[in-house]
Amino acid sequence: MSAARTLPGDDPKAMLAGQVVVLLEDDELIRRATERMLRRFGAEVVTGASSREVLAAAAARNLTPSCVIADYWLSQEEDGLSAAGAVREATPRSLRGLIITGDLSREVAEEVARAGFVLLRKPVNVDKFLDALTREI
């Protein structure tokens, strides 16, 4: 379990309020649970299982992403790192984000670091997830 938050500026609700978070996750149950949690903290959430889905959904709602979260092993057609990169390329500002994986390989860690994203390894507890996310907003 991670240490409790102690700094007053670390309130995730204050930091996520009004932020547009893109969530790339192919597992519908995980996607829904994560979306609900992010909405509880005040984020506007755009979800999908591919970059094409989330970019279309963001455009339909006229939203510009503040941050992207992607499962590394998204699908056979598009991995999470590629999908997050596509969202970044389509965003008119510098976009940061999190790549989440259970993969423990050094190669994946290096690939994520080269792409400029933060790697979180599963299982990720809520405090660690929120801390990493608020640092990327």
Where in the sequence are the language-model features?
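Non-catalytic signal-transmission and effector/linker regions of two-component phosphorelay proteins
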Residues: 1-22, 28-29, 35, 52, ...
